[in-house]
Amino acid sequence: MAKRSGSGLQSSAGLMRYYEADKNAVHIQPKTVLIVGALAGIAVLFLSAVNGFWP
C-alpha cells in the first residue's frame, strides 16, 4: 500500500486559521456574564415592583 502524503498539512492549516481567529475574538469572563445577568434580573424585579406589576 502507498502512503498518503500531504494529509497532515491540510488539517494543521485549518487549526492555525481557527487559532488566529480565536485570538482576535472578544473574550468575556464567565463571572462577568453571571453578574450582568443577576443585575438585569434584579432590575426587572425592581421595575415591576415599582410599577405595580408584582404578582
Swiss-Prot record:
Topological domain spans for side Extracellular: 50-55
Pfam families assigned to the protein according to its UniProt record, in alphabetical order: Sec61_beta
InterPro entries membership: Preprot_translocase_SecG, SecG/Sec61-beta/Sbh
Topology Cytoplasmic: residue spans: 1-29
UniProt keyword Electron transport, yes or no: no
One GO cellular component term: plasma membrane
TM helices/strands, residue ranges: 30-49
Disulfide-linked positions: none
Subcellular location field: Cell membrane
Single biological process term from Gene Ontology: protein transport
Record's keyword terms, sorted: Cell membrane, Membrane, Protein transport, Translocation, Transmembrane, Transmembrane helix, Transport
Annotated membrane topology: Single-pass membrane protein
Function recorded in the entry: Involved in protein export. The function of the beta subunit is unknown, but it may be involved in stabilization of the trimeric complex.
Similarity section: Belongs to the SEC61-beta family.
Subunit and partners: Component of the protein translocase complex. Heterotrimer consisting of alpha (SecY), beta (SecG) and gamma (SecE) subunits. Can form oligomers of the heterotrimer.
This protein's name: Preprotein translocase subunit SecG
Gene source species: Methanosarcina acetivorans (strain ATCC 35395 / DSM 2834 / JCM 12185 / C2A)
